[in-house]
Amino acid sequence: GGPYAFGL
C-alpha cells in the first residue's frame, strides 16, 4: 500500500 515496490 506504500509508495514503494512492496505490497505493504
UniProtKB/Swiss-Prot annotation:
Keywords for the protein's UniProt record, in alphabetical order: Amidation, Neuropeptide, Secreted
Membrane-crossing residue ranges in chain numbering: none
Cellular component aspect of the GO annotation: extracellular region
Protein name listed in UniProt: Carcinustatin-9
Biological process according to GO: neuropeptide signaling pathway
Cysteine-cysteine disulfides: none
Lineage start: Eukaryota, Metazoa, Ecdysozoa, Arthropoda, Crustacea
Location(s), subcellular: Secreted
Family: Belongs to the allatostatin family.
Source species of the chain: Carcinus maenas (Common shore crab)
Residue(s) carrying Leucine amide: 8
Role this protein plays: May act as a neurotransmitter or neuromodulator.
Main subcellular location: secreted
